[in-house]
A protein has these predicted regions:
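Flexible, acidic active-site loops/lids enriched in D/E/S/T/G that coordinate Mg2+ and/or position polar
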Residues: 1-9, 13
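General beta-strand structural signal in soluble alpha/beta enzymes
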Residues: 4, 61-65
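Short glycine-/acidic-enriched loop or helix-start segments at secondary-structure transitions
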Residues: 12-14, 105-106
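DPxDG-like acidic metal-binding loop motif
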Residues: 13-37, 41-45
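Long, positively charged amphipathic alpha-helical accessory segments at protein N-termini or as interdomain linkers
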Residues: 36-37, 43-61, 71-232
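Conserved active-site carboxylates
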Residues: 68
């Protein structure tokens, strides 16, 4: 695992820039060799962040499909998985977790370099902003890693048992992840490159893909894209 106090070229999904206040956040990358499908890494990491927020700050957070963690409607954390294979053909994954821990949300604005990025300030938050007090990054990291390790080892054990991914560990993670999704049941838009698809987020399948019911009644499977919630 690698931790840093600052990133000069942090990245989110689809090449987006991850911006944070130096010395205030959790910026971590964990090298793993999962024996299970990578989408389960996204699920377990998202749940680890949600659980750690609840334990550390007594704040209820939710997951925005596929891998953002929200408090209310504002993003407080993001997950990024990058995968490859070693020379023996074994899966290698880097699990990146970024959490806005300390600092007031207003502090983020000076680190945004364009009008588009500056507009994102209205959709971000920090744990300190919501909790009202500075949060120990060390305590948060320890709790988060404990949750990641527990779920990761359970999935590794399940994968080597020869009974596939329908056993309790993966099923429990899927069910808990689905239960924390704030996206389901909402009318949303999904931006995919230059195109946009709108409809109601009806469910997710076992692979974590989003099932979107379009206004025509057609149900389409969404494997990637940026989900946008309409203004309330």
């Amino acid at each position: 695992m690698v931790l840093t106090d600052n990133q000069t070229a942090g990245r989110g999904r689809q090449g987006r820039r991850w911006v944070g206040v130096p010395g205030r956040n959790v910026l971590s990358s964990i090298l793993l060799r999962p024996l299970f499908p990578p989408h389960l890494l996204v699920m377990l990491a998202s749940l680890a962040v949600v659980d750690s927020i609840a334990e550390t700050c007594h704040i209820h957070a939710t997951i925005k499909w596929p891998n953002d963690v929200l408090i209310g409607e504002r993003k407080v954390a993001g997950i990024l998985i990058e995968t490859s294979h070693d020379l023996a053909g074994r899966l290698v994954a880097v699990l990146g977790i970024g959490v806005n821990v300390n600092g007031r949300v207003e502090e983020l604005s000076e680190y945004y370099l364009s009008d588009r990025q500056a507009s994102l300030i209205t959709t971000a938050t920090t744990l300190e902003t919501v909790y009202g007090h500075e949060v120990s990054r060390e305590v948060f990291i320890a709790r988060m890693l404990l949750h990641v390790e527990k779920s990761y080892l359970a999935l590794q054990q399940e994968s080597t048992s020869g009974r596939g991914i329908s056993e309790p560990a993966s099923r429990l993670i899927r069910e808990r992840w689905r239960g924390q999704l704030s996206t389901l049941g909402r009318t949303i838009s999904v931006q995919q490159g230059d195109s946009k698809i709108s409809g109601v987020a009806e469910d997710v399948n076992d692979n974590g893909e989003l099932l979107l019911r379009r206004h025509s009644g057609e149900v389409v499977t969404i494997t990637w894209g940026n989900v946008e919630y309409p203004a309330r």
